[in-house]
Amino acid sequence: MPMYQVKPYHGGSAPLHVELPTCMYRLPNVHSKTTSPATDAGHVQETSEPSLQALESRQDDILKRLYELKAAVDGLSKMIHTPDADLDVTNILQADEPTTLATNTLDLNSVLGKDYGALKDIVINANPASPPLSLLVLHRLLCERYRVLSTVHTHSSVKNVPENLVKCFGEQARKQSRHEYQLGFTLIWKNVPKTQMKFSVQTMCPIEGEGNIARFLFSLFGQKHNAVTLTLIDSWVDIAMFQLREGSSKEKAAVFRSMNSALGRSPWLVGNELTVADVVLWSVLQQTGGSSGAAPTNVQRWLKSCENLAPFSTALQLLK
C-alpha cells in the first residue's frame, strides 16, 4: 500500500540543534555516552537549608513524643484491663492529692468566659416526672461556694407540677441587685425527653443528659485530678447513666458489685473526696429505687454518708 513520504527535519548525520527555552533548567542527555553533569545545575541544592533541617528536627521530636504518649496509653490500658488493675489504680489514687471542695477556688471567667456587665446564667430544662436530683445537689454545693441567683419557672408544656418541685430552691428573696451575683441558676420544669442545659447560645451548644450536665457543673468547683482519677470518675458517671439506669438486672447487679468493691477501699467511689461520680450514682439510685435494703453493705454505708450531707438530704425530700 503506497504511503506518502515525509522529508527529514535534520540533515543526514549532522547533529540535531534544537533551540530550547531559557526559562527551564537543563538535564543531561539520557542518550549521551558521556556522564557529564547538566550544563546548568544551579537549581540543585548540595546541602539542606537550615530551615529545612530545623523542620526535620522538629518533626522527629513530635514523632518521639507521640510514641512516648502511645506507650503510656498502652500501659495504662493494659493496667486497667488486667485482674490486678484495682490494686495499681488504688496506689496511684493514694499518691494523688485532690483539692477539696471547701478550700479550692476557681475563677468562673476561666470556665464560663468573660461577659462584661452580664450575669453568667445557667438555664436547665428538666422534666418534673424525673427530677434530676444530682443537679439539685450540685446547685446547693454551688450556693455554698458562689453568690448564686436561683430561679424556678414552669413551662406551659407541663401542668400540675408538685409544689415541692416549684419551691425546690426554697424561698428566693433577692437581697441584692442582679449584677452583684456571681452566677445565675435558672431551672425550668418542662416536658423534655432529656434534661437540657443552655448557657451561651453564641459560644456553646446545649448539653443534654443529667450526667453530662453534672460533669459541667462540677467542673465549676475547680478540683484538680490526674488522668487516671478523671478516667475513673467519667467511667462511674457513664456506668450510672447507661448500666444502672437503663441496663438489665444482671448489669445492675454487676454495678452493685463494682461499687461495693470500690467502697471497700475508700469512703467515696474515687478516693477520699466527694466527686461528681458519687453525686450522679446517688441520684440514679434514688430515681430507680436501687437504694433499698437489697444494696450491699458498703453501698448502704455510702448512701448514709451521702444523706448525712445537707445538699443530699434536701434533694431527697423532693421525692417524698
From Swiss-Prot:
It holds the Pfam family AIMP2_LysRS_bd. Residues 82-162 are annotated as: Interaction with PRKN. Residues 162-225 are annotated as: Interaction with TP53. One of its GO terms (molecular function) is molecular adaptor activity. Disruption phenotype: Reduced levels of component enzymes and associated factors of the aminoacyl-tRNA synthase complex, lack of complex formation and lethality within two days of birth. Neonates display severe hyperplasia in a number of organs including lung, intestine and liver, lung failure, and disturbed thymocyte proliferation and differentiation. Embryonic fibroblasts deficient in Aimp2 are resistant to apoptosis following UV irradiation. Phosphorylated on serine residues in response to UV irradiation. SUPFAM superfamilies: GST C-terminal domain-like. It is found in: Cytoplasm, Cytosol; Nucleus. GO terms for biological process: apoptotic process; negative regulation of cell population proliferation; positive regulation of neuron apoptotic process; positive regulation of protein ubiquitination; protein ubiquitination; protein-containing complex assembly; translation; type II pneumocyte differentiation. GO terms for cellular component: aminoacyl-tRNA synthetase multienzyme complex; cytosol; nucleus. Keywords: Apoptosis, Cytoplasm, Developmental protein, Differentiation, Nucleus, Phosphoprotein, Protein biosynthesis, Ubl conjugation. It comes from the Eukaryota. The modification Phosphoserine is found at residue 36. Part of the multisynthetase complex (MSC), a multisubunit complex that groups tRNA ligases for Arg (RARS1), Asp (DARS1), Gln (QARS1), Ile (IARS1), Leu (LARS1), Lys (KARS1), Met (MARS1) the bifunctional ligase for Glu and Pro (EPRS1) and the auxiliary subunits AIMP1/p43, AIMP2/p38 and EEF1E1/p18. Interacts (via N-terminus) with KARS1. Interacts with EPRS1. Forms a linear complex that contains MARS1, EEF1E1, EPRS1 and AIMP2 that is at the core of the multisubunit complex. Binds FUBP1 (via C-terminus). Required for assembly and stability of the aminoacyl-tRNA synthase complex. Mediates ubiquitination and degradation of FUBP1, a transcriptional activator of MYC, leading to MYC down-regulation which is required for aveolar type II cell differentiation. Blocks MDM2-mediated ubiquitination and degradation of p53/TP53. Functions as a proapoptotic factor. This is Aminoacyl tRNA synthase complex-interacting multifunctional protein 2. It comes from Mus musculus (Mouse).
